[in-house]
Curated annotation (Swiss-Prot):
Gene it is expressed from: atpC2
Gene Ontology CC annotations of this record: plasma membrane; proton-transporting ATP synthase complex
Organism the protein comes from: Ralstonia nicotianae (strain ATCC BAA-1114 / GMI1000)
Subunit structure: F-type ATPases have 2 components, CF(1) - the catalytic core - and CF(0) - the membrane proton channel. CF(1) has five subunits: alpha(3), beta(3), gamma(1), delta(1), epsilon(1). CF(0) has three main subunits: a, b and c.
Key words, A-Z: ATP synthesis, Cell inner membrane, Cell membrane, CF(1), Hydrogen ion transport, Ion transport, Membrane, Plasmid, Transport
Topology of the protein relative to the lipid bilayer: Peripheral membrane protein
Classification via Pfam families: ATP-synt_DE (PF00401), ATP-synt_DE_N (PF02823)
Gene3D superfamilies, per database record: ATP synthase delta/epsilon subunit, C-terminal domain (1.20.5.440), F0F1 ATP synthase delta/epsilon subunit, N-terminal (2.60.15.10)
Subcellular location(s) of the protein: Cell inner membrane
Name of the protein this chain belongs to: ATP synthase epsilon chain 2
Record's function text: Produces ATP from ADP in the presence of a proton gradient across the membrane.
InterPro entries: ATP_F1_dsu/esu_C_sf, ATP_synth_F1_dsu/esu, ATP_synth_F1_dsu/esu_N, ATP_synth_F1_esu_C, ATPsynth_dsu/esu_N
Keyword set includes RNA-binding: no
Lineage: Bacteria, Pseudomonadati, Pseudomonadota, Betaproteobacteria, Burkholderiales
MF-aspect GO terms: ATP binding; proton-transporting ATP synthase activity, rotational mechanism
Length: 139
């Protein structure tokens, strides 16, 4: 079975490098499922969960907050603004960030404040989704 080479990098580190039979990334227009042989594509990433399905069906779950995905027929490169393994996320901090963003949304006085609050809320919700996905996967 053909496999994809997968690299997830930030400006600070290479978070993941390996092979996979399937990858799901959070594109700005929705989730993209990528199999070997995918047409070349460059797309922006939104905050969300990256799922890397290994050859043995184990799953590596990562959280990304923005960046770009460069997809080639046998390779997926994610250049993320922020990337963290889901198991390393702090659920209490993500819940607190979500609550703070919701309060900021309600109290925002300008379009800039509102947009910032929306972005912070999207990131917190995406972190919580990654945590939940990783939790379900462990069962």
């Amino acid at each position: 079975m053909p496999l994809l080479t997968v690299d997830v990098v930030t400006a600070e580190e290479r978070l993941y490098q390996g092979t996979a039979k399937f990858v799901v990334v959070p594109g700005t227009e929705g989730e993209l499922g990528i199999l070997p042989g995918h047409e070349p594509l460059l797309t922006r990433l939104r905050p969300g969960t990256v799922r890397v399905t290994l050859e043995n069906d184990d799953e590596v779950i990562l959280f990304v907050a923005g960046g770009f995905a460069h997809i080639l027929p046998q390779e997926v490169i994610l250049l993320a603004d922020t990337a963290v393994r889901a198991r390393d996320l702090d659920e209490a901090k993500a819940q607190q960030a979500r609550k703070a963003a919701e309060e900021l949304l309600q109290n925002s006085r300008s379009k800039i404040d509102y947009a910032r609050a929306q972005a912070e809320l999207a990131e917190a919700v995406a972190q919580l989704a990654a945590i939940e996905r990783a939790r379900r996967r462990r069962r």
